[in-house]
């Protein structure tokens, strides 16, 4: 947002401090100091419907002077314009020559034309202080209707860094409104007059467009407040009844905390988020409200980040716990499924056994019934055959109503019929017998399979887990097992059949003392016998490791035997040497004895001679 006040000193931070009394007194700072007047008055214009004829050229001159950094010339020109305006608004009838006649004439024309079109009750006479007083203490019925709100110029921007004074902002302030837009030259005419400074005009137009876009802020109302001066220029004085809250002036040591609304908003938001932060802690009187806001914002950001990081850590821990619980649940579910499967298998086997036993009982009953029926049928058949064959009945000694049978023949035939083979039996009996045989074979096979399963369960319960043992412990265990095997003479036999021996081996291994070492070479293990006999016991271990261990064991044994053999050879050598020495000594003794004998003989011969 561009304005004349920004070109005087270059920044808003360098503006002077003043109170409300300076605006309502004839001999105040605003009347005496030209720079304050220039800061206070900001006669900018809307290029469409406001005074542009002279003001825009002056603004362009100021922009040029600002680029050339001629601050003294700027202050002089602005001082002339402001003085001419105040002399005209104070209703002085002196029409003496001003310092800049052209500028004064422009302001007079605009003010007179605006005054003609006003109503009688809107015309205000008197000094500048009366206008201010009338604007502040105006009644509610005398509120003026602002028809041309779009013609409002840029707002006056007054700032005060004093802690106990009012703050003037752009949001609730309005400036000069032209009351004679009919005789103001058009935009094209203004642009032709200042053809030299086209670039500056474009920048100036952009600044107004930016302000028009920003004018829809929530703090800038559609209609200006009541405390607005009337005339060619309108001023706004912020009172405690306006938009923003003001500090208590009565308290001397109170200091204004500029971000109080922001702090309240943050307190509410943090309370909804269940975050406890003392935003009022750490406030110092010597620190400005901007620095205090920065400190508070940093404190809030740090606390929020810490809270978020803690929340993330808790969430991660919960996720890890949930994953662990999920894994445990999966393991439990798998175990439950396996248990259910085993139970179902056991129940199915039980059902099969019960059904088979029932079938056996039924078949036994049927067999008994069939046997009874077969005996009855046999007797009936035999009787029928006997009757057919014995048709020749003796009737010689037969009285009335008496039959005589040949008893001898019937008895012989009955004896022959009892020795009939099975092929002469009826089909039903033969089929039932075949069924019984088949069922008996099946029952026999099931009983064998059950016995095998029982043996396997016993063997599995007896097996050892060698993964628990170290290498040294395993070597000692091998030695102890070899001793046990030699003691029980299990070589050449399968350990599956010798359950008692397996149990004894397990007891010996459990009662094994690791300090015992068997150094005898007679307790060697052979690979083939080891694999053949101890395979079912050590089903969970790799035989390559056993081979390596046995090879190492054999190497140590061979080295020990070699040492023993070398020692034995040395002993033999020593013994041979001893024998050789003995033989030499004997030989020497013999030589000495022969010499003595010869000497004695020679001596005797000499004596005789």
From Swiss-Prot:
Annotated Acidic residues bias: 210-219
GO CC term (a single one): septin complex
Key words of the record: Phosphoprotein
Compositional bias segments (type: Basic and acidic residues): 200-209
Modified residues (Phosphoserine): 159-160
Biased composition (Polar residues): 169-179
Keyword Phosphoprotein annotated: yes
Region of interest: Disordered: 1-24, 162-225
Protein name, per record: Spore-specific protein YSW1
Native source organism of the sequence: Saccharomyces cerevisiae (strain ATCC 204508 / S288c)
Lineage: Eukaryota, Fungi, Dikarya, Ascomycota, Saccharomycotina
Name of the gene this protein is made from: YSW1
């Amino acid at each position: 947002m561009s304005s004349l006040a920004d070109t005087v000193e270059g920044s808003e931070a360098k503006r002077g401090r003043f109170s409300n009394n300076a605006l309502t007194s004839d001999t105040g700072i605003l009347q005496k100091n030209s720079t304050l007047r220039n800061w206070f008055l900001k006669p900018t214009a809307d290029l469409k419907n406001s005074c542009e004829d002279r003001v825009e050229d002056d603004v362009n001159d100021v922009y040029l002077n600002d680029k050339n950094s001629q601050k003294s010339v700027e202050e002089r020109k602005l001082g002339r314009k402001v003085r001419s305006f105040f002399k005209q608004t104070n209703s002085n009838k002196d029409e003496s020559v001003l310092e800049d006649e052209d500028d004064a004439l422009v302001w007079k024309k605009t003010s007179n034309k605006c005054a003609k079109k006003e109503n009688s009750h809107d015309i205000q006479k008197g000094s500048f202080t009366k206008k201010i007083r009338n604007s502040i203490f105006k009644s509610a019925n005398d509120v003026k209707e602002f028809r041309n709100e779009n013609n409002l110029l840029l707002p006056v921007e007054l700032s005060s860094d004093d802690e106990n004074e009012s703050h003037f902002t752009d949001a609730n302030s309005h400036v000069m409104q032209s009351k004679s837009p009919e005789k103001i030259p058009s935009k094209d005419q203004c642009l032709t007059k200042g053809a030299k400074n086209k670039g500056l005009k474009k920048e100036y137009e952009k600044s107004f467009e930016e302000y028009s876009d920003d004018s829809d802020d929530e703090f800038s109302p559609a209609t200006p407040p009541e405390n607005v001066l009337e005339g060619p220029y309108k001023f706004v004085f912020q009172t405690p009844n306006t938009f923003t809250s003001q500090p208590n002036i009565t308290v001397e040591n109170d200091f204004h905390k500029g971000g109080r609304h922001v702090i309240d908003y943050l307190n509410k938001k943090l309370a909804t988020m269940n975050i406890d932060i003392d935003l009022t802690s750490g406030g110092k009187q010597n620190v400005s409200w901007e620095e205090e806001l920065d400190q508070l914002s940093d404190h809030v950001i740090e606390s929020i980040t810490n809270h978020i990081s803690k929340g993330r850590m808790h969430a991660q821990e919960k996720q890890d716990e949930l994953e662990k619980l999920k894994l445990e649940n999966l393991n439990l579910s798998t175990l439950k499924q396996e248990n259910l499967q085993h139970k179902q298998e056991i129940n199915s086997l039980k059902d099969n056994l019960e059904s088979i036993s029932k079938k056996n009982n039924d078949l036994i009953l049927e067999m008994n019934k069939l046997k009874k029926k077969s005996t009855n049928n046999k007797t009936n058949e035999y009787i029928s055959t006997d009757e057919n064959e014995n048709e020749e009945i003796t009737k010689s000694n037969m009285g009335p109503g008496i039959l005589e049978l040949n008893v001898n023949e019937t008895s012989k035939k009955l004896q022959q019929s009892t020795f009939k083979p099975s092929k002469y039996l009826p089909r039903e009996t033969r089929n039932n017998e075949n069924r019984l045989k088949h069922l008996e074979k099946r029952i026999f096979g099931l009983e064998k399979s059950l016995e095998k399963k029982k043996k396997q369960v016993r063997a599995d319960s007896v097996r050892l887990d060698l993964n628990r043992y170290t290498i040294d412990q395993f070597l000692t265990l091998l030695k102890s097992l070899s001793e046990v095997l030699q003691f029980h003479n299990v070589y050449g036999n399968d350990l599956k059949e010798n359950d008692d021996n397996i149990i004894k081996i397990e007891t010996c291994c459990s009662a094994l003392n690791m300090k015992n070492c068997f150094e005898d070479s007679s307790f060697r293990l052979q690979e083939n016998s080891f694999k053949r006999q101890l395979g079912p016991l050590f089903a969970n271990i790799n035989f390559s490791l056993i081979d390596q261990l046995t090879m190492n064991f054999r190497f140590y044994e061979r080295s020990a035997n070699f040492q023993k053999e070398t020692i034995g050879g040395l002993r033999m050598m020593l013994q041979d040497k001893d024998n050789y020495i003995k033989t030499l000594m004997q030989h020497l003794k013999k030589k000495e004895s022969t010499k003595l004998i010869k000497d004695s003989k020679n001596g005797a011969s000499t004596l005789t001679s």
